Amino acid sequence: MMTRKQDQEIDHAFLEMRVRDAWEYRKKTVDTSSCRVIFGEADFLPGLVIDKFSDVLVVESLALGIDRMKEEIVDILKAVLSEDGITIRGVYERSDAKVRQNEGMERVKGFIGEEFDTKVEIVENGVRYMVDVKDGQKTGFFLDQKYNRLAIQRLCKDAEVLDCFTHTGSFALNAGIAGAKHVTGVDASELGIEQARENARLNGLEDRVEFVCADVFDLLPKLEEE
């Protein structure tokens, strides 16, 4: 649902209103250096997700109706951000979820506009990450886990920590930066582990935070035996 008004025209002015409302809300509630700027139904733009990672936008479109408007919405968002002095250097589309096929759409992955370096560094909760918006999972990083990652910091000082399904190491790194004695992160994805190790180096944590590429369900019984 985009509006509750039956006579509301879905035009450029309407889309600009929705985008401005979404951005103004983020400015009041979250750290906007990296955040989910557009969150589908929550912003009355159903089926559309736009994540901002520093100066990069990542777009995920999951419904046919909004798919036809996505590039116009992206252009509006870039213009709105520029009013706050924010220049977007690139936009990448990650509309590669299977659910698109339910509405007869192909799975799409690629640049919207000019090509650019798809790796971007962000900082969250005092932890530095290199996000790969092209090859990472989903839109590149799980922004929705920000406060769960922060909560980990309060629990991990002087602890030994095992982070299963670590992806790019975000929970492991939050444990490490909070003073954990030793942290092991495990994931079956070689790419994810490679990125996690790079993130550990970015934060100077490679001596206390290690990453293992393995199937968690195979590894846990072995660890239990040790």
Each model region followed by its residue ranges:
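A short interface-forming secondary-structure element
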Residues: 56-67
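Non-catalytic substrate-recognition/targeting regions of SAM-dependent transferases
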Residues: 41-51, 70-141
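Non-catalytic accessory regions of SAM-dependent methyltransferases
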Residues: 1-54, 202
